Amino acid sequence: MLIGLNGDSIRGLRFLFIYDEVIELNKRTQWTLLCLLGAILLLQGGYNSSISFIASFFLLFIIVIDRSKFEILYFQRNISLAAMVFLGLISSFACGYGSYSLAHLAPYCMFLSSSFVFTSVDDFDFNYLIGGLRYICFISSAAAILLFFVFPSFFGYVSAGRLQAYFQYANTAAVWFALSFLLLLDSPLFTKIDCLVPFIALVLTRSVAVAILFVFGLMIYLILEKRSMASFLLAVFGLVLILCIYEMMSGRIVESVQTFIERIIQIYDGLRLAGSSPFIGIGPGAWRQSYRFVQSAQYSANVIHCGYLQILLDGGIFALTAFLWFCITRMICIFKERSNIPHSSFVVAGIVLMLLHFMVDIDIQFAFIDLLLVLFLSRGNEKYSIKELSFGFPNWANKGCLLLCLSIIFGLTTITCYRSYLIEVGDRGPSCFEKDPEVTENYLLRLCDEGEYASVVDAADSLRLRSETSELQLLKIGSLYCMDMRDDAEECLLELIDMQKKNVDLYKTATAYFDYYGISNEGRIRLTRIENQANEMIERPPASYLRNQVLYEWTQLN
């Protein structure tokens, strides 16, 4: 796979190690950023909130310790991202789930921290960082292909015949490999044969949607570059078409279409949820606990598959406006002065690819993708940016805001790491963690393992758990059954089913309970009525557009 790495490419490796007076000032910072990018990539792309918070704090911290005198010359570029974090905090305290909501602020903190880094100094060498990133692209793509064929069971890198690589999620891995292809294509140090390495990795992910977006992004790149590469584009398009035909013959194309329809339904349900609290949102991460009440079809989704709607739900319409303002203003700056910006064609193509895929997937949950997006958008922070969109801040105010953000992210990092510890040991923790569904669930699970069923019921009642947290309610119901309080358990379970008629997992759990403990005649009549209502609902659009909807036969229960 290294056959395409020619002599020029090998000599180009010295680009990472040479002494250059122009970049020597920030060489240490940029080396640190490259190492951090590689570390986040290996750690599941920063999907874990604790890892994302630690990386965000580290990004801000290196600005302070690496430069005794720094100036945030373009802090106005960070205002919108800072607003996202503060709006998320307000939403978290107003209608969230304690530390659970705070943990879901990690992506927004990564946006803010990385933006601070790329606007903290005026002599930041973008070319140096991109030069190192190219080798990360090539090495990570080659390693992913090797693991796919040699060690397919390595840490979940391959699942159901699809390459998930470092993200353990095939679609986001496909986005990374598509960006890697464009990044290598934009480099004079790599040949078109070298570009085959990330392209093969992209094909192995079997992500049809990303493959189509990749062709679109490649077309944008070639148009902006004004390069006559019609045969090259045709070859890439042909290979993507072959992938689509193969997926169609294997039957997975039908599954992909069904998945796309399901995500459209999720967006519809998410908009209904957002309508209940449009200005401050429903709280970061609250989608997982709330969507069962509004779902229009039978699906299970802990995270909504639309990045923009996720921001709307987490922080309200103002948070979404702040994010879109940041992206749009940076894109305007890049387009306006793209002739003066190195790698502007790749930057535009990469940004478009990521922002389009945000519409139908969860890429925004990965700190690595967030960092890349801000890195590319920060090309609009140069001294030739649109002056009409700029307004000054005294440097003492900029530094004060930086230290304030550093303190907030440090606090969130501490809370999230302590929360992870409580989940691991199954402890209840201080009272401020009682509203956290995951902390409480593991605490109640530990009580169940110890046979303290009465304590589980008392704890559930004393915490006044929200009815939508079905996992916690099921622990209470199971404890009631174990205490031989079948009537109370049956009543709680039927109420939960009635509220969540399209919760497939809940139906399966209820079936197991009723098969084992039995059900009263009154309960059977009520259950049959719920079944009829559920069947009528899933036979109507939009649920009827999905083939995986299940009609339950409750009358067969013993």
Where are these regions (language model features)?
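Short active-site alpha-helical segment characteristic of glycosyltransferases
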Residues: 308
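Transmembrane signal-anchor hairpin modules in multi-pass inner-membrane enzymes, especially those
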Residues: 1-135, 183, 187-192, 219-234, ...
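A membrane-periplasm/extracellular boundary helix in multi-pass inner-membrane enzymes
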Residues: 142, 146-151, 202, 210, ...
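TM-adjacent membrane-interface loops and short helices in multi-pass inner/ER membrane proteins
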Residues: 264-302, 311, 315-321
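Short, conserved phosphate/pyrophosphate- and ester-handling motifs at nucleotide-, phospho-/glycolipid
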Residues: 169, 263, 366
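Alpha-helical transmembrane segments of multi-pass inner-membrane proteins
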Residues: 30-42, 53-63, 85-92, 103-117, ...
